[in-house]
Structure formats: C-alpha cells, structure tokens
Amino acid sequence: MCELNNKRVSWSKTGLIAYADEQSTYGNLCISFLETINGVNCRFHPPQRYVIHPQLHEVPLKTETGNGINGASGSSTAQSNIHGTTSVPGSAGKHQHQFFYDISSIHWNNWFSLPGDMLAVCDELGNMTMLIAGQSPDGPTTLDKLTMLFQDNVYKIHNHVMQLEPERENTDSKLERKKTKKEYNTTILDFHWLSSSKPVIVSQFCAFDSSINMYRNKAQQLSPHGIFHPPFMKYAGLAIRRNGQLDFWYQFSNSKDHKKITLQLFNPHNERSKGLDFLQYAKITSVNNDNSILITTYSRLTGKLSFYKLFVDWNVNTAKPVVLNDPSLKIKHILDATVDQTDDEGRILDFTHVHVLAKVVAEKDAAPEVLLAYDVVGTPESLIKRFKLGQVRLPLDYLGILKPELNTSNENHNQALRSNRSNLRFLGVLNLHHKVASISSEVLDGFVSFYYRNGEIEIYNQNDWKLETERLLNQGPQGKFSNIITSILSAGFKYPTIKNLGTVEWIRVSPAMAGILYKYRHDDLPQFQPMNIDDVSDKSKDEINAATMAFGYVTSAHRQLSGEDIALACKQHILKIAKIDEKRAKDFTTTLMFNLYNFFNFSPGAPKELMDKIISSRPLQKVMLLQLELGSIFTDENTCEMARVILYLKNVSFAFNGVARNLQFAIEQMTNSTNSSNPPLSGDKFFQTAFSKQDLVHSLIPVTKWFVKFITYLIQQILILTNDPENPDNRLVLGVFGAKIPRTLILTILKEIKNVTAIITKFPETNYPILNESSTYLKMLLIESPINFEKFETFLMDVNNKLSAFSEQQPSIMREPTLLVRSSVPNELNKITEFLLQYSSNTVISHADASAIYFSDTSGLRISCDEFFEPGVHRLLQPIEDGIVIDEKNMPATFRDSKTFTKLTYDGITYDRFSKEELSDNKLKRCNRCGAVTKAGYPIPTNKTIVPTSISTRRWPTMYTRMCICLGMLYEL
C-alpha cells in the first residue's frame, strides 16, 4: 500500500503545485504551476527548487522589518509548551556541514474555507516547516514566492521569518542530502488544517428540469463543522506522529509568535506504553456530529485500530473579549478494534490501509465512515470494508430486561437508545477487481478515489457508493428531473490509465476532479492528464456533457479553486469535437457557457439592479476567464475577443471608480487640514498629498486612451458593416452593443468618467500648477475623442430600452448567450442587426466625422490573440492526441522562456506602454491563465510620473500584486 506516497504532492487552491524532490542533490521541495503558452496549450512552469533542512531557522535574516507575514518576527522562539520564550537564532556558521532529508508529506491549507496560501512541509525525521506564499518580510509578493514563518524540530518551535530563495544547481552549498532507510518514530503521519469560521457554498447536484427545458443545479451554504478556529486566531493545525504524539500549532491574530501544544495518544488500559507506540497508519478527520476531531491509528506493535476524539476549548473570555487565552486540548480514547485476517469465503486478507471520511453535508446520521482496505492474498483483487463509527445502539427489548421501569413507548425514548460507548457498525463491502495502491478523498470528503496498481483510477460517491463514471447508466427520471449529475465525471468521463506505475512516484486527482497529476521518479516535472471520453462522435451527448462540465466548473468556483484543471479538460474535449466538426464545437461551447450563466444564477438579460451586481461580481470574471480560454481554440476569435473585452471593461470601470473614491478622500484630507483648528500639513506632507492625488489622475491616462480607442474601434466596425452587412471579420460590435453585460459596463464607465471629470474640474490643483497637467491632459483626451461620448451614451441607453422591449415581445433564452459567446445575432433575429446598424448610424456616426473615425489608429487594443501572443507559439503546438499540456522538450528552442510567449508591448492591467527600462529591470509579472504581462503593484518609475520626485507610488491596489484581472495567478518573469 506504500507504493505511492501521494502525500508528497499538494495542489493549492491558488494553482501552485508543491511536490517533494527525492533525486536532486541541491533541493528537496519544488514549486510549479500550469501556465498558458498561447491560450490553448499550456506547460508546467520550470520548478523553483528549495532546500528545506532542520537548521533553516538558524539562517540569518536578510531584513529586520518583520512585518507583513502573519505578524511574525524573526527573533523569537516558542517552546513546545503553551508559553513562548525569546532567544536569538544561532549563527549560520554554527554547523560547518549540514544535512537535509527527504520530504515525507506536504499540505496546503485547502480545507473548507481556507485560502490555500500556507504550506506545511514535513520531512522524514518529523521536522515541520511552515511556509506562506505571496508574502515576504517586506510585504505582499507574487504567489510563487515562499517565506518561512516558523520551524518545528519535533521538540522545539522556532519563530523565524525569512524569505526563501530558490536553489541553483551549481551553487557551492554546504548542505548535503542524507538518505536513510530508517523509519523514525517522530515522522508525521498526517497533518490537518482547522477551518476558519467562514461558511462555504457547496454544489450538490444538477439535473435536467423538463418543466423549464434546461438544467438546474442545487447549491447550499455550509457552515464549518467539527473544530474550527475562531476569528481571533490566524490559523490552527495539528499533526499526528508515528509515536502517537499529537502537535497542535496556532497563532493569535494580534501576536507575532506561533505556538504549539503537545499531547500524547495512549490507551488508558496500558498507560506504560505511552509514547512508545509505533503507528503504521494515522488519519485526522474533522467530524460533524459532536464538534470534535477524530484521530484514527493502526499500530504495528498491537495490531489494533484505535480511535480517539480531540476536543478543543478556545477559552473565550466572554466578560473581556479582548483578553485572549491559550486553548485547552483534551483527548478521549473511544474504541479499539482488530482487523480481519480472512473474509467470509475463508480467503486470507492482508490489511493495507485505513481511510476515514467525514460527513460534511448535514444528514440525520453524521457519523464518520471508516474504510478498511485489504488485499485478497493470491488474487489480483482488493476489498474495502465499510463501517460507521458511532455510538452503540441498544435494542428496546434488551433495555426492557435491564431496566423494566423504562417506558419504551415514550416518544423521547430515542435518547435512551444510544450508549456513551462507540462501536463500528458494518455497512458493506466493496469488491474491487484490482489491487489498491492508494486511497484519497476529494471535494470535502464527498468522493473517494481508489488508485489501482495497474494504473487505473476510479472514484466513488460517498452518499451511495456508486461509481461516478457510471452514474447515468440505467438512471430513470425522478418526477420532472432526469440526468441527475453529482460530479464532473457523472456523464461518463474517465481518467486515462497511467503506464509503468512501478516507476511513478505519486499520483493525485486534481482539485476539481477534472484530471490526474502524476510524476515519474526520474522526471523533473510532473504530468497532467485531463479526464476524457474516448469517443466524442455521438452528437446527442453534447448537451449533457456540456452541462456536466459547467456544473464541475461552478463547483470549483464555489470552493474558490483556481480551476485550470477543469479548463484544460474542457479545451481538450472541445478540440476533439472541433477535429470532427468546428461548428458543432462552437455549439458545444455556447451550450456550456449558457449552463454556466444559469448555474451561477445570473441572467445576461437581467434588470439593471441585478445587472449592476453581476458586472461587479467575482463569478463574472470566472465565467469570462473560461470563455477566453475556450475561445482561443477557434480560428474565429469573436468568442475570446468578447471575453477579453468584458474583462478589460470591468477593469476600466474598477480603475475609474477607485480613482474617484480616492480623489474624494485626498481632497477632504487637504481641505480639512486647511480649515481645521489642527496643525496644518507641513509643506512636504502637503506636496506629497497633492502629488498622490494628481498621480491618481495620471494613472487614468493610459486607461482612458485604451477606452477611447476601443469605442472608436467599435464604430469603425459599424461603418464597415453598414457598407458590407455580411462581412465576417467585423462582428464583435454586434455582441458588444447587443448583449446587456458589455453594454452595461460601458454605460457604467461613462458614468464614472463624468464623475472623475467633475471632481478634477471642481477641484483643480492650484497649489502646485505643474501637477495639474495630469488633469488637463485627461480632459483633453476625452474632448479630442473622435466619438462624442454624450451622444454615444444616449445611443446605448436607447439601445437598452429598445432591446428590453424586444425581449419582452420575443423571449429567447439563447439570444443573450449567443451574443456573449459568439458575438453574433441568431439568424431568426436579424432585425436586431438591422436595428443596431441603422440606429448607430443615425445617432452616433451622423454627429461625428466618419472619415476621421475610419482612419483612426486602433491598433494596440490587444483583444485578439494575434495581438496578444507571439506568432511563433500562436497555434496548436502538437496534435490533440498527444495532449494539451506540452512537454518543454517538445517546444521550439526559441520559445522555452515564459517571456517569449506574450508580446511585451503593453501592460495587461494598467494599459500603459512598456518602456525599454521597464522591460530590462526584471520586474515583470505574467498571468498563468490569460498570459497578460504587467508591472501593476510595483513602484512606478520616476520617468512615468507627472514630475520626477522621491515619492514612491504604486497606483494599483495590492490585489494586483498576486492576481490578474481574470483572477489568474501572477508570477514573476
């Protein structure tokens, strides 16, 4: 059962993949992620390799600021009791020669509502190093940067904040990998993150509703269960070691120190064995029924399964909430059990693993389920015995004998039927036709993955223990519902079989269950294989397959997963269809996106109040990101262009809205300083405030240039279509003007532009006139636009009203999705095309210089893939039969650096043109999903401010340090 150590890899919600490196001589931890090459193909980013060794906490700090990382400082250590002590870390030269060891397990904080940015790394000796992504001692960084928070060397915890630097192969290091075959009794067997108190949204199923002739999904908000840390805690986690030692780590929100509490598991009947056990398996499970954590162990010495419950008292002081007390922990031994030696047929069984599942979704019986895995000796089979761990149920007749006075007919007799003792209630057996190499659970323990030794993987649903890939087989309708889908595999999608499993180091099902991640022992990088259906020729299955993929994507979005695994699975499936029939592939994409809008509960034709919420929501970005990725498949770029336009417009709206709010704040600050009785701002401080205010305006100049150019581009397309209505290359404008989402976004931007213009006109910068040039230039850009924005706004509002009236007269559920996805008007609704062309000519073009519009330079919008990606990679780089993820060795030699994929001309977030200095200072970031390159979040160079000053300004919010406008992850180039 130990053939695959699947705990040596962890795929974060953010998209980062951390895995152990057992071959390298200069590192033992790798960080990689999937990055887009050209919008269609992607690859694993070359791994950053780190060396995690027991003396890492002794390395001197490079910075003494100590801020930004969970408040932890680099100069204190906390002993293994509750109270912290302070000491100075040892010198790096203390050990002339040091060793590092193999990593035994890696754990991102992905559980429940946690964000997936903290990483617990455990080596085979039992040392645990806590890391965080996206933070440094000096503040926020990109997510691909790691910083150590503290290190636990089994007996002592060392608080030491230090940013980790990737190792290079040729560095002269005194660190040496030490291989050992010994099994240490301090090795961490399992690690569990405690959830925060935030609830999550869980998708339960989707089904076809015959009453409305479309698929509907059911989701519910789920509160955390078991033990979760209160808001005054930053995090909490616990681990179980081979010797039965339980370590509990935590940090208060107002504290710099990380603390640890240590307990020992032991059987009360044999206390002398305390700390001397040698566990083979251990599992920590957050259970739902009594606010506890279940700890399950199997001992080699005793041959017994033991079950314990951990209770945590957070010691909240209700009288003085500001007083924070350390938590108290209590362990209770609840049951011992033995494993079977033979089955019912007398065949010899070899016990191989124990796996425990929580019942996350509240049910009448929320007791955890225990799986005991056995190999059937002499056969290729395995069997899984299922048990329910709960309180002993006492029969009524038995109770009547023991206690005759008990009234068993009483309505409240149910309370007397359960004893305080626990037992394992047998539920059934799963007979598996292949030997099991490993077991894992997915999606909050709702699904169980069995990894077979022949390279196959199967997933069962915990609710009914049916094979997910066969869910729709022989499934009959239930009332008005049919085709009930519970996961992304329900429609018959399967995982590919992994070849040569004996050389595979680990395999894991991806976070959204849309594929498998695995690594061969002597390969540097892992491989990813999306789920698939071998035969895609049956067109009748397109509708249910599209609904299944949409349901899977919504499920991953609700769980805050990055979702690149499911995007790749969708792309691969559509590419297979496109190879047969491209029109059918476009229809499939439209159906998938239509279901996506439906499952997210927003209608593209919603009224204004709801539409305002939709355009500012995170789900809209997730939807447009998928449309962008799927649209990159087709030679007709309208699908991906529309997605990129909506993402860009959303960003422009965000920029103007943010600047307007910050301008108001700066003006109030300066006015209050002048008029109040408090001491006025000093000259330097006053200039700094004035400079920051006007620099906000300056940041809008490239954004405004892009917006003016984009509106001009749309009217250019109107001019072309007016003269040539059948022109196939200039139809994006029909989708932008015809669909309500982009129309609403443009109207919102025009409103924000008027707001900003009114502020800078009413409050010009008079104290430092040179700073007011940014306001003057911004107004000039708007005035000199070839499009009259007032007339244009009136036009869009009229279009809104007329199309809303048209929708009431001729309702159509597919009109808006078709406009949004294909940027085209359905043939049966050609009146919309005629109306848009005629009305825009009468209201917009008639009040402008048509020749000036037609000959305006609208290059550099970067809404098409041709403008975005380098020509050398802007194509399908290998046949789809060879996979959608490219091995770096198969790429053109000149296109192996991430810098070579995207055209480095314009900033993808600020819309500013890169200068030569910016391109050469090695401070560029790229999005792993859409491919945008940006410097947003970094200090602005002095040659790009109004006047050169010593004031450091970043302009764009901290959120753009880590995340792109499409919600992809930014990484440094």
From Swiss-Prot:
Cellular localization per UniProt: Nucleus
One Pfam family cited in the UniProt record for this chain: Med16_N
Principal location listed in the UniProt entry: nucleus
GO biological process, one term: cellular response to heat
GO molecular function term, any single one: RNA polymerase II-specific DNA-binding transcription factor binding
Keyword vocabulary terms for this entry: Activator, Nucleus, Transcription, Transcription regulation
Extent of the signal sequence: none
Membrane spanning stretches: none
Example of a GO cellular component annotation carried by this entry: mediator complex
Family: Belongs to the Mediator complex subunit 16 family.
Subunit: Component of the Mediator complex.
PANTHER family: MEDIATOR OF RNA POLYMERASE II TRANSCRIPTION SUBUNIT 16, THYROID HORMONE RECEPTOR-ASSOCIATED PROTEIN-RELATED
Known role: Component of the Mediator complex, a coactivator involved in the regulated transcription of nearly all RNA polymerase II-dependent genes. Mediator functions as a bridge to convey information from gene-specific regulatory proteins to the basal RNA polymerase II transcription machinery. Mediator is recruited to promoters by direct interactions with regulatory proteins and serves as a scaffold for the assembly of a functional preinitiation complex with RNA polymerase II and the general transcription factors.
Protein name: Mediator of RNA polymerase II transcription subunit 16
Native species: Candida glabrata (strain ATCC 2001 / BCRC 20586 / JCM 3761 / NBRC 0622 / NRRL Y-65 / CBS 138) (Yeast)
Taxonomy of the source species: Eukaryota, Fungi, Dikarya, Ascomycota, Saccharomycotina
